[in-house]
From Swiss-Prot:
The keyword Hydrolase applies. Belongs to the archaeal IMP cyclohydrolase family. Its EC number is 3.5.4.10. This is IMP cyclohydrolase. GO terms for biological process: 'de novo' IMP biosynthetic process. It catalyses: IMP + H2O = 5-formamido-1-(5-phospho-D-ribosyl)imidazole-4-carboxamide. Pathway: Purine metabolism; IMP biosynthesis via de novo pathway; IMP from 5-formamido-1-(5-phospho-D-ribosyl)imidazole-4-carboxamide: step 1/1. Catalyzes the cyclization of 5-formylamidoimidazole-4-carboxamide ribonucleotide to IMP. It is an enzyme of class 3 (hydrolase). Pfam families: IMP_cyclohyd. NCBIfam families: PRK04151.1, purO_arch. InterPro entries: IMP_cyclohydrolase (IPR010191), IMP_cyclohydrolase-like (IPR020600), IMP_cyclohydrolase-like_sf (IPR036795).
């Protein structure tokens, strides 16, 4: 099954995570790049001109603000993170940013998905489509994911990871995510005592 872009946030006794996966049939030539406390999705070498074909394929997907990690499938990462830096709570930052930015105006009306979670495991995950918006609370000990296609309402998931590398691998091809096709790149932030980031570019 093809889900497109996927985000997941959650926590367990092992720690707190926020992860992201790009699955793509149209623009598979992309990679994750870490820049301080952020992860960006950019075209691979030789595919830089793809951004002129689709402006939505390059963006920050993870941003860490003190004890909070934001993860999304687009430029609204910066909007949500900016609101949180200004003092807005996670729920309002996620919901307002999704509502304001709306779904992507491409050929597929691609939904925007986004989430934020703190080091206590408290978070919110949401999606805005051409039909509406949904934002769900994530409690400590819970894990949820949502994708741009098919599974486009937050679903609970058994997510196994004890560090950033394992969280990155899991959303790429672990557990239920192994059933979803066309993985391109993945990344994750994980917090046990402090935030760490990892990424996978096959």
């Amino acid at each position: 099954m093809y889900l497109g872009r996927i985000i997941s946030i959650g926590s367990s006794k092992d720690g707190v995570y926020a992860s992201y996966r790009v699955s793509s049939r149209s623009f598979p030539n992309r990679k994750s790049v870490v820049n301080n406390q952020k992860v960006a999705i950019i075209p691979t070498q030789g595919s830089e001109d793809d951004i002129y074909k689709n402006p939505y394929i390059s963006y920050n997907c993870i941003d860490i603000i003190d004890d909070i990690c934001v993860v999304t499938n687009g430029s609204h990462t910066d909007i949500i993170a900016g609101k949180i830096r200004e003092g807005m709570n996670m729920k309002d930052a996620v919901a307002l940013s999704l509502l304001t930015m709306d779904y992507e105006k491409d050929d597929y009306n691609t939904p925007r998905i986004g989430g934020a979670i703190n080091t206590k495991g408290e978070g919110y995950i949401g999606i805005v489509t051409h039909e509406g918006i949904e934002v769900k609370k994530v409690n400590p000990g819970e894990s949820f994911y949502v994708s741009t296609y098919e599974h486009n309402t937050p679903r609970e998931v058994d997510y196994t990871a004890t560090n950033a590398k394992e969280a990155t691998e899991f959303i790429f091809n672990g557990g239920i995510f192994s059933e979803f096709t066309h993985p391109v790149t993945s990344c994750a932030a994980f917090n046990k005592d402090e935030w760490e980031i990892d990424f996978k570019n096959p």
